[in-house]
Amino acid sequence: MELAEIRNTAEWMEKKLDEYKASLDLETKISRIEELENEMTYPDFWNNQESAQKVIDESNGLKAMVDKYQHLADGHENIVLTYELIKEEPDVELQEELESELGDIKKKFDEFELQILLNGEYDANNAILELHPGAGGTESQDWASMLLRMYQRFCDKQGWKVETMDYQPGDEAGVKSVTLRIQGHNAYGYLKAEKGIHRLVRISPFDSSGRRHTSFVSCDVMPEFNDDIDIEIRTEDLRVDTYRASGAGGQHINTTDSAVRITHVPTGVVVSCQQERSQIKNREAAMKMLKAKLYQREIEEKQKKLDEIRGEKSDIAWGSQIRSYVFHPYSMVKDHRTNYEVGNTQGAMDGDIMGFIDAYLRLMNM
């Protein structure tokens, strides 16, 4: 790499840092961190643990953003200083180190830019993720369990906490449906990219003839809302059923009817929760999920009306998959919205899906 190229890269970084500083309004974020840290010193801070956790999560998210910006600024400063040294007194070894450092920090700039793209109203929220197999019985239910593992691995890599709110085991293998609550800064902002139909093509382990099968699973993702979201839910519109909770493999995980299923009769929206041992707590959690689903439904209906006005039509049939995972006759995972693809299917199934999410978020912000 020529010195002129190093200088151009350093100038590009300086320009990017100025853009980031303006768009992020860093001074306001730093002031907000101070407010939150002051709030944490109140004697009654932990009286409401849920409220306290929200304050901590907001503070951690803001700190992470400010710290990452500062890390990039420090890296840029170091590159400029090293460049000036080499320009005055050429040093091959030092220049090679600088070139390597440039590659690393440029990658960090790309990662930081992705985080800035998460500027939606609810992107910072926790996420509720649901998986529902399509037709195909055991095949699709097994595919749902594979996707469940993939998302659990992905969330682990992000340092997010995953709770299984509802789990309906498959008849022979896999799952009939599963609902996860994912706690972490920007969980919804990232995972919204996964909403849609996921298609698998493979040689079936359940087919003695070794034939190739295609399976589908629907992934739904919603933001988890705080209590301040304005959604009217009338008690008379709800049907509440209780049942005995089941764990993976079909075993009962509770000896009482603590699991709760709530049906919103006017819309037919159904939510279930069996995470807690207490029926009251399961009902509270289910009501949060219902609120999220009804809000999401309201947004989608508004979007549908806008699409009709514009003459657009969204196809939500099983054929409109967002991503295909092909295990046979070749190995490839391809996102049909962005055309981003990888040949390492095992890596994707182990949770390495940030590349797909990155490509989708960049496409949506073009």
Swiss-Prot record:
Q: Does the keyword Signal apply?
A: no
Record PTM text: Methylated by PrmC. Methylation increases the termination efficiency of RF2.
Report the protein name in the record.
Peptide chain release factor 2
Q: Which organism is it from?
A: Exiguobacterium sibiricum (strain DSM 17290 / CCUG 55495 / CIP 109462 / JCM 13490 / 255-15)
**According to its UniProt record, which protein family does this protein belong to?**
Belongs to the prokaryotic/mitochondrial release factor family.
Q: Which UniProt keywords apply?
A: Cytoplasm, Methylation, Protein biosynthesis
The compartments listed are:
Cytoplasm
Q: Which gene encodes it?
A: prfB
Q: Which residues carry this modification: N5-methylglutamine?
A: Q251
GO molecular function terms listed in the Swiss-Prot or TrEMBL record: translation release factor activity, codon specific
Among InterPro entries, the record links this protein to: PCRF (IPR005139), Pep_chain_release_fac_I (IPR000352), Pep_chain_release_fac_I_sf (IPR045853), PrfB (IPR004374)
Here the disulfide bonds are none
Q: Which domain of life is it from?
A: Bacteria
Matching SMART domains, A to Z? PCRF (SM00937)
Q: What is its main location?
A: cytoplasm
- Role of this protein: Peptide chain release factor 2 directs the termination of translation in response to the peptide chain termination codons UGA and UAA.
